[in-house]
Regions:
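Helix N-cap motif at beta-to-alpha junctions
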Residues: 10-13, 47, 114, 138
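Conserved C-terminal structural/oligomerization subdomain of aldehyde/semialdehyde dehydrogenase
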Residues: 28, 55, 78-172
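Short beta-strand segments
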Residues: 7, 66-69, 133-134
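Flexible, acidic loop-helix segments that line cofactor/substrate-binding pockets
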Residues: 1-5, 21-53, 68-82, 99-104, ...
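Glycine/threonine-rich helix-loop capping motifs at alpha-helix boundaries
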Residues: 11-39, 53-71, 90-97, 147-156
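Short beta-strand and adjoining strand-loop segment in the mid-core
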Residues: 5-12, 87, 172
Length: 172
């Protein structure tokens, strides 16, 4: 699993956005069995075209492309189905990308003023495989755990991975 949406609250916006951009730009994309490669291709030509189409539509809906992973061929695999990490900033919460499971190396950033607003953004999706929060506040962690509508909720972890013995459907 990988997060497809990140929501910052308040002053965390700038430092988080900068850190994510740096991380995305440092990833080595290529053939998965080559030494040092951290990310391989998407599964098919159709998948690549679908993901690139969703990225394009998101910009029409107001998102800014912070890191663009499209049209970056991998040496020796120019016809491969590679999309480098892509980060979209200020994603429209009512846009298609905010409500679609993209299944590609794309992170959509949204920004909220309050925890309540962030939880509302989390709950605005039909799908909710996971939702995670990073906080030093026990009260905020409990509020998020109780109010976020997701199959798996994580506190201070990057991916709330499902356990085989828990029901898991991906729906809110």
């Amino acid at each position: 699993l990988a997060a497809s949406v990140a929501i910052t609250v308040g002053a965390a916006k700038n430092s988080f956005t900068e850190s994510m951009a740096d991380a995305a730009l440092s990833r080595k994309v290529g053939y998965g069995l080559d030494s040092g490669v951290q990310m391989g291709p998407v599964i098919s030509k159709e998948s690549k075209q679908r993901i690139e189409g969703i990225i394009g539509k998101s910009t029409q809906e107001g998102a800014n492309v912070l890191v663009d992973g499209r049209n970056k061929p991998v040496s020796g695999y120019e016809d491969g189905y590679f999309i480098h990490p892509t980060i979209l900033d200020n994603v429209n919460p009512n846009g298609d990308i905010a409500k679609t499971e993209i299944f590609g190396p794309v992170l959509s950033l949204m920004h909220a003023s309050t925890v309540e607003e962030a939880i509302a953004l989390v709950n605005n999706r039909a799908y909710g495989n996971m939702a995670c929060i990073f906080t030093s506040s026990g009260a905020v962690a409990r509020k998020f755990r109780n109010e976020a509508d997701a199959g798996n909720v994580g506190i201070n972890i990057g991916v709330a991975a499902p356990m085989a013995f828990f029901p898991f459907s991906g729906w809110n």
